[in-house]
Amino acid sequence: MKIPVTYFVLAALVTSSAFAGTADYVYMPAVEHGEREIDFKYGSGTPPAGERQTVSSLGFGYGATEYWFTELYLKRETEGNSGDVTLAEWENKFQLLETGEYPIDMGLITEIEAPVSASGPWEAKVGPLFQTEFGKLQLNANALFERKYSSDGSGTQYPTEFSYQWQIKYRLQTEFEFGAQGFGGMGEWDNWVGSKAEEGHSVGPAIFGKFPVGNRQAVKYNAAWLVGTGATTPGHTLRMQLEYEF
């Protein structure tokens, strides 16, 4: 086991809405010590009963240890003509097992999001990350628990909600790989039947690639076109991610 159990417990204690945001991406469990990363994400889609939602973010991440990667983001959200909302996000990823030591690699993600330009609740997320391989196929599946916390002193209580991510990737060559991605939310984590109105799922084809540019530097990309179902999920979502690693 790569990460001491103490860190696993602390991470779970620090962090505890089921809708998959238009710029969400599939988390990977692996961590590379010393790696620095500038990360840009973008997503856009229109839910059945709402206006177009556009989300973009810019972040900087660092592989602080062999098992811990930390990243800070600034995120901008726009919905129709209602103006922009700016959020700050702190993401921490922990690699729990040595890569390839067991048939399934495992990690843990924790994330805290706070409003910057407007009042609103904080959000926290935590969940296990899984990855396995069959020949040139790479499979990922993540289970996430999310909760909002009131920041205005109103004492508003929010439920803990469950969401998921999955990805299938065929590693054709380093510069171009293809597959599919899926995101979804089930509503309250312990009351899926009563949360049917909040349930939403999206799935679609995806492409991936990595271009080495020398001296441990690389540019990575992935993008997907997702088809959604549910009252809160856009019928079609375009999402993309561009990373510069150095």
Residue ranges with predicted function:
Residues M1-V26:
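Cleavable N-terminal export/targeting peptides
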Residues F19-F246:
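Transmembrane beta-barrel domains of Gram-negative outer membranes and organellar outer membranes
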